[in-house]
């Protein structure tokens, strides 16, 4: 359901995985159901946006069309309940600081760790000033059920158009985000490339 919003032609159905004795079977009705798998159309990984960008094979018109498609999905996406905690100023701040904690655990060469600490301190000091804006966006309905993992490797050229796929299904907190944050992930990835 979630990924068909972005790529209805890529997602076929959900297959049952069963255990039949010592064997796992996909799509079988025999045995105990142990899991489910999403069945998708197989596409050429060379058509993923990261590979296309690397080869210089992306046209501005394609990116414009992708932006229009994502905006259309966002405009129809379910708004997150303001009482759910999704998109609350406290949660946005915590996610921001958690990202810095994860990055600080990486073995990065200097001056990156020093710069990350400076940026983290700035973000922590600036967060209280941004909290009213975050609250305003929450109340205005900009926190919605988004893609949640929108980056170049999760976009493919399929049937001559760029199409987002592989959105977050396993964790509602990662997909119930501000629509601006959803598109920002892809924008930053494109800018970095």
What residue spans do the PLM features occupy?
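Generic hydrophobic/packing signal
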Residues: 3-7, 18, 42-47
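Generic detector of contiguous secondary-structure segments
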Residues: 1-2, 108
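ATP-dependent phospho-/nucleotidyl transfer catalytic cores
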Residues: 24-193
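Structural motif at the C-terminus of the N-lobe alphaC helix and the adjacent alphaC-beta4 loop
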Residues: 2-9, 76-77, 190
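Conserved HxN/HPN-centered segment at the entrance to the catalytic loop
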Residues: 6-24
């Amino acid at each position: 359901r979630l990924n068909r919003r972005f790529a209805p032609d890529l997602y076929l159905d959900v297959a049952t995985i069963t255990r039949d004795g010592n064997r796992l079977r996909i799509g079988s009705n025999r045995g105990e159901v142990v899991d489910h798998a999403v069945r998708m159309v197989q596409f050429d990984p060379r058509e993923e946006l990261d590979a296309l960008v690397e080869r210089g094979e992306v046209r501005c018109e394609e990116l414009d069309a992708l932006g229009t498609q994502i905006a259309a999905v966002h405009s129809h996406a379910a708004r997150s309940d303001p009482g759910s905690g999704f998109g609350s100023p406290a949660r946005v701040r915590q996610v921001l600081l958690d990202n810095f904690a994860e990055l600080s655990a990486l073995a990065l060469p200097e001056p990156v760790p020093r710069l990350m600490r400076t940026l983290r301190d700035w973000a922590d000091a600036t967060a209280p000033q941004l909290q009213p804006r975050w609250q305003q966006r929450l109340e205005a309905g900009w926190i919605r059920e988004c893609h949640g993992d929108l980056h170049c490797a999760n976009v493919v050229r399929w049937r001559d158009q760029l199409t987002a796929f592989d959105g977050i299904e396993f964790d509602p907190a990662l997909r119930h985000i501000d629509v601006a944050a959803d598109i920002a992930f892809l924008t930053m990835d494109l800018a970095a490339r």
